[in-house]
Amino acid sequence: MSELLSVALFLASVLIYAWKAGRNTWWFAATLTVLGLFVILNITLYASDYFTGDGINDAVLYTLTNSLTGAGVGKYILPGIGIALALVAVFGALGWVLRRRRHHPHHVGYSLLALLLALGSVDASPAFRQITELVKSQMRDGDPDFAVYYKEPAKTIPNPKLNLVYIYGESLERTYFDNDAFPNLTPELGALKNEGLDFSHTMQLPGTDYTIAGMVASQCGIPLFAPFEGNASASVSSFFPQNICLGDILKNSGYQNYFVQGANLRFAGKDVFLKSHGFDHLYGAEELKTVVADPSYRNDWGFYDDTVLDEAWKKFEALSRSGQRFSLFTLTVDTHHPDGFISRTCNRKRYDYDGKPNQSFSAVSCSQENIAEFINKIKASPWFKDTVIVVSSDHLAMNNTAWKYLNKQDRNNLFFILRGDKPQQETLAVKRNTMDNGATVLDILGGDNFIGLGRSSLSGQSLSEVFLNVKEKVLAMKPDIIRLWNFPKEIKDFTVDRDKNMIAFSGSHFRLPLLLRVSDKRVEPLPESEYSAPLRFQLADFAPRDNFVWIDRCYKMAQLWAPALALSTDWCVSQGQLGGQQTVQHVDKAQWQGKTAFKDTMIDMERYKGNVDTLKIVDNDIRYKADSFIFNVAGAPEEVKQFSGISRPESWGRWSNAQLGDEVKIEYKAPLPKKFDLVITAKAFGDNANRPIPVRVGNEEQTLVLGHDVSTITLHFNNPTDANTLVIAPPAPVSTNEGNILGHSPRKLGIGMVEIKVVNVES
């Protein structure tokens, strides 16, 4: 309703100003500004919905001040460009319409009415309401009801008798199981859902809307609110250290806790969270690659669901035979947005909707088949009678190719339970949320019926029932929840552990690299993750007088303040203010002791602007002084004009990547010498090993043969045509996720370059 009202007020404002207000520069500028704000707000809402599927939320607030990288970001580039072009076009059209009758005499009354209507359209828009509530949540000091409703459970279950299998279905919300809306989409898992305790109204709250947040909510009974973006949790050394979560209780009660997934455990700090709360046995992409039947059978995120659930079944069987009390948690990935992935063992690899194939629906149909097969194996085993099986979505689906169809339905998360000890078939329509999942499971296992803000849906009352405005209530509790992290409020002395890649201060430990914003009463950690911008881009957003401590590889800060370290991949510590003084110190000991020293100096805005501009230089445009191309640092030597076909720097060097160019091309500013040696230190990937690799300069071509290990080879070139471009053409680029950033499309690797040096041998 408010959306229609805001649009009506917007149109009324445009029409009244365009046809009645007449010409006046001030009124035109004011009205265009407010109407433009309406347009920006609604385009932001549309874009946010596209990326998150949940409007303008915490994730969007973070993304507005950082970069969206990782996780299939390439698939969002075209929509992003489209949104930007639409914004320019709408602004141009709006200005043209408002000036249609600019030659008519000015009328103050109509101008004022148009401006008031424009202001009303902004105030009534859902985007403005969402942003207002989000900003309020950042500024509140907490909610007095938090202490009333936050409850810590007992640390043990008296006399536990049941094993637990807990399956997180990636984005596998209950909406998919509506057979009227999506006929025969989930027949296998839907049939199992109907055999158990099916909770039909599990809503999604703020801070529970992505995988690690959904896991925290379901096990600890709180949303994932942190003083940093939630997916950057991999940088912390402990996760809500004060909280008692489901895994802690299980471990204290004699359970061995296992977690199995196909993706890398480090992504979003799942390993840190699980290790912090009772899980001693973790299996992700790195751990599984040595035990799965086909290590090369992977998607962009890791191993397919059929592989992961096969390994989960092996774990279940072995643990059940051992007689040891255990919990086995597993997380699927094939239904990850934006398109999903199809396991090769599925019987149904295609699902049509609206008369055409839909990749996301197809992935859902396939994944639920794999999950159902896993559950049916457990049900058919002699150990089911001692087992509780839980199936839940980690969060609602984000913007995938099925999302517009999902939004036409009443959306809820999936949560159902199959009890081997006490079969029970019932659909429970009680209002609840994902924070209640862990408490409900704990209740069934014989423990308390509450964890944090979560309550058992079998014997307690959910916050979703207590508060009609439960989303706003949870946002009001955000400061209280952040305080549970027990983050330090000051930093004076700190220690950098060079071997463990950690920094410690005020009793807290963080993985490196790390950026800290330091104020009188707060230390704000800004980690680097797959979803966040590089730290130098985050630092570029600091105000001129903001105090910072930045721990990163030396070459990343050297271009600003320490040119002598431009080729160093060691750790360095920089601190200061972007508009004031900065220092860079080389970490030259295994245990390096540092102190903060922020000087209260005059702010130089020219220096500030220069620092910000330099921080924002993209990697490929960075230049350093060197007599060779060093590939394990960003940029290139000053003599290089541009290069292509080369992937990002890694600790050892860089791969060629045919996704970025069929050949490696390095164009120098000046012609290469008439006669020179080309010294190449490199290795080959896959089928490129032990094969001739063409290397060209002008009309002359040599061949290079590399093995799988790094070697140094010298080629002799004549350059009579004064060519300035070096071309290397790997013969058989291999599509692979080897060494890839999680969620990115596969790279096509050919050769791995460590160093290339041009040696002039002209007499």
UniProtKB/Swiss-Prot annotation:
Cell cycle among the record's keywords? no
Give the bilayer topology: Multi-pass membrane protein
Provide this UniProt record's keywords sorted from A to Z.
Answer: Cell inner membrane, Cell membrane, Membrane, Transferase, Transmembrane, Transmembrane helix
Q: Which Pfam families match?
A: DUF7024, Sulfatase
GO CC annotations, alphabetized: membrane; plasma membrane
Q: Which residues cross the membrane?
A: 4-19, 26-48, 76-98, 110-132
Q: What does this protein do?
A: Transfers a phosphoglycerol residue from phosphatidylglycerol to the membrane-bound nascent glucan backbones.
Q: Which NCBIfam families match?
A: PRK03776.1 (NF003000)
| Entry protein name | Phosphoglycerol transferase I
- What organism does this protein naturally occur in? Salmonella typhimurium (strain LT2 / SGSC1412 / ATCC 700720)
